[in-house]
From Swiss-Prot:
This is Large ribosomal subunit protein uL24. Keywords: Ribonucleoprotein, Ribosomal protein, RNA-binding, rRNA-binding. GO terms for molecular function: rRNA binding. Part of the 50S ribosomal subunit. Belongs to the universal ribosomal protein uL24 family. One of two assembly initiator proteins, it binds directly to the 5'-end of the 23S rRNA, where it nucleates assembly of the 50S subunit. One of the proteins that surrounds the polypeptide exit tunnel on the outside of the subunit. It comes from Serratia marcescens. It comes from the Bacteria. One of its GO terms (cellular component) is ribosome. The keyword Cell division does not apply.
Amino acid sequence: FEDAKKVRFFKSNSETIK
C-alpha cells in the first residue's frame, strides 16, 4: 500500500486549503 504518501500529501493539502 504505497498510498500512505498520497494520503499524507492530501491531508497536508486539505489543511493548507482550510
